[in-house]
């Protein structure tokens, strides 16, 4: 896991779906802004993505690189590579995104009213198998609860059991999403000209 103020490691990506393949180490001294979203995330398409598109259009030639990363930490049947490819080629959306955008009149014939103009990749998704290690659970907990070690033992055991249940329910680990300790979608990753993580 990377912290704000540290060197930003390259994103772990599965497949580039739109635009030229890139990563932090290939973008020189540009500021890097990464929009992390899920295909099945209404808020991503209603609020965050239009803002990121505006930023991209305003600053794309002025030392800012913008790209998108579609991830999946839930709804694995909807947040798929296939649905991302369909979204980027046809503008068609699925699931809760389709329902919400339709309800608010933000679709034209079931398709987005805008195109995503910047490069987009799919997060690297690793199939979960077996029991989560104590070390993995501890790292996850301490990222969420920094004062975990000072808590009573019975409370700590309850938290471990909840986290174990959570990890068992996960079908995949989304490597970029987890490496940057993102809490949900939409999220952004901001890296400065020197490659230092400035905000998530």
Residue ranges and their predicted role:
Residues 148-149, 153-160:
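Intrinsically disordered, low-complexity domain-flanking/linker segments in eukaryotic proteins
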Residues 21-53, 65-70:
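Short active-site neighborhood of thiol/selenol oxidoreductases, capturing the structured segment around
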Residues 11, 119-124, 140-144, 158, ...:
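A short, hydrophobic beta-strand/beta-hairpin element that forms part of a small beta-sheet core
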Residues 113-131, 157-186:
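Alpha-helix-centered segments that form part of catalytic cores
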Residues 1-25, 162-164:
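N-terminal "domain-start" segment that seeds a small globular fold
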Residues 4, 26-27, 60-61, 111-115, ...:
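Extracellular/periplasmic catalytic domains that process cell-envelope and extracellular macromolecules
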Residues 46-150, 172:
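Structural microenvironment flanking redox-active thiols in thiol-disulfide oxidoreductases
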Residues 1, 106-108, 174-178:
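Short, P/G- and charge-enriched loop/turn segments at secondary-structure junctions
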């Amino acid at each position: 896991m990377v912290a704000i103020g540290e060197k930003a490691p390259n994103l772990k990506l599965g497949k580039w779906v739109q635009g030229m393949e890139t990563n932090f180490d290939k973008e020189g001294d540009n500021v890097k802004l990464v929009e992390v979203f899920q295909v099945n995330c209404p808020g991503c398409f209603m609020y965050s993505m239009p803002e990121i598109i505006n930023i991209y259009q305003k600053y794309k030639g002025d030392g800012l690189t913008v790209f998108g990363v579609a991830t999946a930490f839930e709804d694995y049947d909807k947040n798929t590579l296939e649905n991302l490819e369909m979204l980027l080629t046809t503008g068609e959306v699925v699931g809760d995104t389709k329902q919400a955008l339709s309800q608010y009149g933000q679709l034209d014939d079931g398709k987005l009213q805008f195109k995503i103009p910047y490069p987009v990749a799919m997060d690297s998704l690793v199939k979960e198998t077996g029991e989560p290690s104590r070390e993995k659970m501890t790292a996850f907990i301490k990222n969420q609860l920094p004062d975990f070690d000072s808590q009573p033992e019975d409370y700590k055991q309850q938290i471990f059991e909840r986290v174990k249940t959570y990890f068992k329910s996960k079908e995949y680990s989304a490597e970029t999403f987890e490496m940057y300790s993102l809490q949900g979608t939409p999220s952004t990753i901001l890296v400065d000209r020197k490659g230092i993580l400035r905000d998530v």
